[in-house]
Amino acid sequence: MASNLSPAASASGASASPATRVKSATSTTSQFGYPRGHVGYLSADEEEALRSFQDVLEERGLYKRGPPASHDDQTLLRFLRARRWVVEDAFRQFKDTEDWRAANSIDTLYKTIQLDAYEQSRRLYPQWTGRRDRRGIPLYVFEIRTLDSKTISEYERLGSKSTFSQAKTDGKTPPGLLRLFALYENLTRFTQPFCTQLADREHPAVPITMSTNIVDIQGVGLTQFWNLKGHMQAASQLATAHYPETLDRIFIIGAPMFFSTVWGWIKRWFDPITVSKIFVLSAHEVKPTLEAFIDPCNIPKKYGGELDYTFGQLGVPDPHWEGVIDWEEGFTGFPTGPLLWEEVDDGKRVACVTYGSKGDEPRRQRICTLPKIWPATAAPEVDAENVAEGTATKTTSTAVTMTDVSEATQTAEPKAHDDGVQTDDAITNGDAVKKLQMHDEKHAEAANSAPPALATTVA
């Protein structure tokens, strides 16, 4: 399915059920992960931090207010969340990222990359299943065993010696890794904006800026982990530095007995916030935990769900897209390669357009269109005092109305290892969902303990 560049296989023949707003037990406004700290769900201090951040960036020539603004609020908020709302720290990371993007022509890389180079990267690294979790966040799967030392060596060799795009480089970022960042561009510029425009989610007025990830390490031996150490460390550190807060949770499946040794390396590649999002699940934890976050119809069969999806193939179209997406040119699913959304019909709809190059020919073909629902005409108002207490409440309804599905509430007393990783014995009696909920509440308490001066800027 993914080996050719023709339109993806057609969507499931099953009839589409009505779009409903589905709430998971771990995605309420009382918890730190989502949507707290996102557009429409900011406390007074967080609102002030965002305004101060915009002022600092504008004063230092890295931001223009527009309209349209040079950078949207949801992007700026990613850097603020990553740096715990300390504006000057967020500025330094933002500036480093902007400098890195300019020095490596990341926009040009994404728009001009050769399809075969893109496809080689796509097949090796985290892949969008075409589905979302219960909150509307895209679900990615990553099977580590595909990254053996021979494959990585060849991947880096071709990347360093081939002209796979029109982008320049800074000579510092390993050329063999640059293709990987076309995939991050696809996440932030295609998948997340697409999921933002889909209304069948719990908070349709909140733009999607994260991803949920299943990382499958079954069948990976200690030698393979060791051989991958350098490559994975470089890739992880660059991604953490320049694509902050694009991960919601990472569920590690199939961990071998020696994984605690491997974890000792891995946790040093990430900042503490990212580390806190990683959960290691034993075999009996996988199905109940994933189902708490993801509808079974969107979980691959390999992990106890109903989705006929195999790592390596293109994303499986969701029946809920029927009646929302208008496919064109014979397409019934999204093809491989760079994709971007562009406004059409006087801003009433958005169109998916292909980019990249096939041979010497640049691609530019319209795949589909769908209604533009975000940004909504009326943004939700939020009680800032309640947000600060972790109980945000909308006071104005959005333009989108959907059917509510009742929400479960659970509590539990967690155990945790000193190193912060959530492992089998940290999730007691198979009650992974309760453990995750308590983890979120603990995270929220830590965030609230930050000094009130966190929004103060440095001139």
Model region roles, listed by residue range:
Residues 2-459:
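Basic, amphipathic alpha-helical/coil surface patches used to engage anionic, phosphate-bearing ligands
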